[in-house]
Design a protein with these regions (language model features):
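Cytosolic nucleotide-utilizing catalytic cores of signal-transduction proteins
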Residues: 1-354
Length: 354
């Protein structure tokens, strides 16, 4: 992000995403929109509180001072956020994805949509799923309806016909009775949002045994179905044969979508490249240590535990990193450096049309 900066990336991203039928909300954790709705109802400043907490490096005292509230008040809000949206703010990847969602929402996000009360319409979903899987290069038919649904997508492209049918029948026979449609590459299974967790728990072992990738979407409005199904295909490319929640990979999917339209090279943080060059020249492993340090919001103890090394060893490595990049990263640079790691870790799919 050094050459053009964050503002340029956001402007370019908005154009590139719209050209593919995506919007910012497709890549954001749904909890952020839920928090924004609570804020509009006057409950509390949840979005601002979460942003302050994440931007402060998960430091409650510093974040509370920024907010001008008591530390205990902020701690209570964080506990409510965790409970209400099934989040674990002790998981560093979750925290980064939430921070990324806030950044994207602030940069190019749209208006907060009211919560839908329309019931799940299995007939409409089935028809739309089959239209999507049977299209032959033509424009996607629009999907009507504001009711919410969630989708599980299974990668079946490498399976023989018999094995594919066996897995399809097993998944469709689960108690949740999903609405299903498929083509040669992907099996899509749609359910009401309240049933997706139970379905994922039951489907995971079946897909693992079949060595088939499984990705689970977040709840979304029916009108976004076509875009979310294409996003599921992207997620399967990243997941391989793993089972993954798409809320845990929003930043990866965002950069995968961008890479299909633009080169990401001008937006890489040069400091990360310098550290990697240092590793290549001297045979060191500073880049791995830097990633753990950044992911853990520059908490030496947590990062050292993740790496399985002594805290003092990591502290020494951090001093060497700082000598390479010139100065310790602040919160803003930490975010840019983490985004660079995400860009560099994108799967090499060789595909340029979802």
């Amino acid at each position: 992000m050094e050459t053009y900066g964050e503002a340029a990336l956001l402007r370019t991203a908005k154009t590139a995403l719209e050209a593919q039928g995506f919007c910012a909300e497709d890549f954001c954790d749904a909890a952020i929109e839920g928090l924004a709705r609570l804020d509009e109802q006057g409950e509390a400043q949840y979005v601002r509180s979460l942003h302050a907490y994440l931007s402060s490096g998960l430091n409650l005292r510093r974040a509370a001072e920024t907010m001008g509230i008591h530390r205990n008040t902020l701690a209570y809000r964080m506990r409510r956020i965790e409970a209400r949206f099934a989040l674990n703010l002790g998981d560093m990847n979750t925290c980064f994805e939430l921070l990324f969602s806030l950044w994207l929402r602030d940069g190019i996000g749209g208006e907060v949509q009211p919560e839908s009360t329309e019931p799940f319409d299995s007939g409409a979903v089935s028809a739309a799923l089959w239209r999507f899987t049977e299209r032959t290069g033509g424009a996607e038919a629009p999907c009507g309806g504001r009711f919410k649904l969630a989708v599980a997508a299974v990668g079946v492209g490498n399976m023989g016909d018999e094995k594919r049918m066996e897995l399809t029948l097993a998944l469709c026979a689960l108690p949740q009775k999903p609405v299903a449609a498929f083509d040669e590459e992907t099996l899509f299974l749609a359910l009401p949002p309240e049933e997706i967790d139970a379905f994922a728990e039951a489907a995971g072992p079946l897909c693992e045994a079949a060595r088939a990738g499984l990705v689970i979407s977040q709840p979304f409005a029916m009108e976004r179905l076509n875009a979310r199904l294409r996003l599921c295909r992207l997620a399967l490319l990243a997941a391989g044969v793993q089972t993954m929640e798409m809320r845990d990979m929003g930043s990866t999917l965002f950069f995968m979508a961008l890479e299909r339209k633009i080169s990401l090279a001008p937006y890489l943080c040069e400091d990360v490249i310098r550290v990697m060059d240092e590793d290549a020249t001297r045979g060191s492993a500073l880049s791995r240590a830097l990633y753990a340090y950044l992911l853990n919001f520059m908490d030496l103890k947590k990062a050292a535990q993740q790496l399985g090394i002594h805290r003092n060893t990591l502290e020494y490595q951090v001093r060497k990193m700082n000598a390479v990049i010139g100065e310790p990263p602040d919160g803003s640079k930490r975010f840019r450096m983490m985004c660079t790691y995400k860009m560099l870790a994108l799967p090499d799919t060789g595909v340029h049309d979802v």
